[in-house]
A protein has these predicted regions:
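Hydrophobic/aromatic-rich core segments of domains that either
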Residues: 57, 74-135
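N-terminal accessory/pre-domain segments preceding catalytic cores
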Residues: 1-44, 59-67, 84-85, 89, ...
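Intrinsically disordered, low-complexity N-terminal segments that are enriched in acidic
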Residues: 33-50, 57, 102, 110-112
């Protein structure tokens, strides 16, 4: 299980980066930082199971914060954690398919969303995708 304090701090940093320098530069900054962190300690989980566990931890911690980070900071933080473990995944951005003005950010592994609602593939159309392993 992930410690709440570092995750909460990371969510605040990612949220601030997005607000100050925008999405593209925030994504680059998060990838840059993930590449410079010390190697992760041994984990019992790997691949998709690890991604699902980390996503649940991020969501649980984010829901307790007073500012409630939305999907983009959560997805960027999960992307950084997966990049650090060299787990192939994609950061995705999409828009609602029903015509409502709404966007969403999520992580996919092998084309399947990680820790998302079952209707995500039909509710949102993917507009942008980037591998978390690409620089």
């Amino acid at each position: 299980m992930m410690s709440a304090t570092p995750v909460a701090a990371a969510l605040m940093i990612v949220r601030a980066l997005i607000a100050v320098i925008g999405f593209r530069r925030s994504t680059a900054a998060v990838c840059w930082l993930a590449d410079r962190l010390p190697p992760p300690r041994h984990a019992d989980l790997t691949g998709r199971a690890l991604a699902e566990a980390r996503a649940r931890s991020i969501a649980r911690i984010a829901d307790r914060l007073p500012f409630r980070p939305r999907c983009l900071p959560r997805a960027l933080l999960l992307a950084a954690l997966l990049r650090r473990r060299r787990i192939g995944a994609d950061l995705c951005l999409g828009a609602r398919t029903d015509g409502a003005f709404d966007a969403h950010a999520w992580i996919e592994i092998d084309g399947w969303p990680v820790n998302e609602a079952a209707d995500l593939p039909t509710a949102y159309s993917r507009l942008w995708r980037r591998s978390v392993l690409s620089a």
